């Protein structure tokens, strides 16, 4: 049997949880995310060209889905790169 003392205990962080980020698109009352607005889309892509997850971007579920589709569409029409050239 394994002894439970193998792993160090995780310490819980004391204090408040970090405040949830508010969706940028909901604040500006933007209904749909347009694939042609490359400047806005670039904020939600990493340096490596990956789409930021919802917990990092702070978007709501509805706008995160629209954002993902808009980024993929912009990549297909060559407005955004698929990957970064090194």
UniProtKB/Swiss-Prot annotation:
GO MF term list: small ribosomal subunit rRNA binding; structural constituent of ribosome
Question: Would you name any one GO CC term?
Answer: cytosolic small ribosomal subunit
Keywords of the record, alphabetical order, are: Ribonucleoprotein, Ribosomal protein, RNA-binding, rRNA-binding
GO BP annotation list: translation
Claim: Signal is one of the keywords in the record: no
Note the Pfam families from the entry: Ribosomal_S18 (PF01084)
What highest taxon heads this organism's lineage?
Answer: Bacteria
Q: How does it assemble?
A: Part of the 30S ribosomal subunit. Forms a tight heterodimer with protein bS6.
Job of this protein: Binds as a heterodimer with protein bS6 to the central domain of the 16S rRNA, where it helps stabilize the platform of the 30S subunit.
This one is known as: Small ribosomal subunit protein bS18
Q: Which organism is it from?
A: Heliobacterium modesticaldum (strain ATCC 51547 / Ice1)
